[in-house]
Design a protein with these regions (language model features):
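Short, acidic, metal-binding catalytic loop of nucleotide-sugar glycosyltransferases
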Residues: 6-16
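Conserved donor nucleotide-binding strand/loop of the catalytic core
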Residues: 17, 31-59
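Acceptor/aglycone-binding surface of glycosyltransferases and processive sugar-polymer synthases
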Residues: 49-53, 57, 61, 83-156
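Short aromatic/hydrophobic "clamp" motif used to bind/position activated sugar donors
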Residues: 73
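Conserved catalytic loops of nucleotide-sugar-dependent glycosyltransferases that act on lipid-linked
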Residues: 118-215
Length: 279
C-alpha cells in the first residue's frame, strides 16, 4: 500500500485532490506505510462511531464518504502487487469527459498463478457466481468484462444515494444499482492493462460468493420504484448468513457472514456537515 500511495502522491497530485486510505484494523503495517507515503489514513472504526462498525470492504467504502469531499471517487484495492498510476487516470477519464457516465469499471489481464500467464478471465467467484447470475437476471450487463473488479470510479452524487453492502458485494451492488437507475449507457469500462494481486483460499471465496448471492437476490426482489426497500434508518439492514464448510478433522467450520447493507449516506444525519454544509 505504501508503494501505491507514494506513486499517486508523486505523479498525480495535480489531478487527485484527496488521497485517503481506509484502514480496517490492519496488523501488517499498511496504515503506517500509507501515512508515511502521504495518505490521510482513517480507521474505519473511528469514522462516525455513533453508527457502529461492521466488518467488510463495503463498510470501508461507505464510511469513506464521511471523510472525503471530492466529486469523483476512485477506489483501488490495497492488495495489488502489479499496477500503475494509469489505473487512476484511466478510471477518471470517462467521468471527466462525459457527464452521462456515472460509473467506470476497470478490466485488465489478470496474472494467473500458472506460469505467469495473463488472462482476461475474471477470478473464480466472477466466473462461477457473478457472471452466471448476470446472465440469468441482468443479461444487459453480461458484456461487463470484469463485474467484480476492485478498481472503479463513481460520481459522489451517485454513490451517496446508494445502499451499500458492508462486505464484498459492494462492486456488484453498485453495478446493478447504477444500471437500474441510469441505464447501461451510464456505465463505462476501461482497459487498465495488466493487474496482479494476492489470491484467496476457496473458503475465503465461499464467503465472498455468499455475500454476492445475498446482494443479487436482494436486488432481484426490489422494484425500481422502491430501490431501498428494507434499508432501515441510519444503521441499514441487519442480517447474517451462516456458512458451513467441511473441515479436515471431519467437523464443520461455521462462518457467520454479515449480509447487512448501509443506507444511502445522503440520508444519514450529519452527512452534509461532513461535506461542509448544514443538514
Amino acid at each position: 500500500m505504501g508503494t501505491v500511495v507514494s506513486l499517486i502522491a508523486s505523479e498525480l497530485m495535480g489531478l487527485v485532490d484527496e488521497l485517503v486510505v481506509m484502514d480496517s484494523l490492519s496488523t501488517d503495517g499498511t496504515a503506517e506505510a500509507a501515512r508515511k507515503a502521504g495518505a490521510q489514513v482513517h480507521s474505519v472504526a473511528d469514522v462516525r462511531p455513533d453508527l457502529g462498525v461492521r466488518p467488510g470492504k463495503g463498510e470501508a467504502l461507505w464510511k469513506s464518504l464521511f471523510v472525503t469531499t471530492a466529486d469523483l471517487l476512485v477506489f483501488i484495492d490495497a492488495d495489488l502487487t502489479e499496477w500503475g498510476t494509469h489505473f487512476v487516470t484511466g478510471l477518471l477519464g470517462p467521468l471527466l469527459t462525459d457527464p452521462s457516465v456515472k460509473l467506470v469499471r476497470g478490466f485488465y489481464d489478470r496474472v494467473l498463478d500458472s506460469g505467469n500467464v495473463p488472462s482476461l478471465e475474471g477470478g473464480r467467484v466472477t466466473e462461477l457466481v457473478a457472471r452466471p447470475w448476470l446472465a440469468l437476471h441482468r443479461p444487459q450487463l453480461s458484456r461487463v468484462v470484469q463485474p467484480l473488479a476492485g478498481e472503479w470510479a463513481i460520481r459522489r452524487s451517485v454513490f451517496e444515494e446508494l445502499s451499500v453492502p458492508v462486505g464484498y458485494g459492494v462492486e456488484l451492488s453498485t453495478l446493478l444499482d447504477v444500471h437500474a437507475s441510469f441505464g447501461l449507457d451510464a456505465i463505462a469500462q476501461v482497459d487498465l492493462g495488466r493487474r496482479a494481486h494476492r489470491h484467496q483460499s476457496l473458503h475465503d471465496l465461499a464467503v465472498m460468493a455468499t455475500e454476492l448471492m445475498s446482494v443479487g437476490e436482494r436486488r432481484r426482489l426490489w422494484t425500481l420504484a422502491s430501490p431501498t426497500v428494507g434499508v432501515e434508518g441510519s444503521g441499514g439492514t441487519l442480517g447474517t448468513a451462516v456458512l458451513r464448510l467441511p473441515a479436515a478433522d471431519r467437523t464443520w467450520k461455521v462462518l457467520p457472514i454479515p449480509v447487512d447493507e448501509r443506507p444511502a449516506a445522503i440520508g444519514v444525519e450529519g452527512y452534509f456537515r461532513a461535506q461542509g454544509f448544514e443538514d
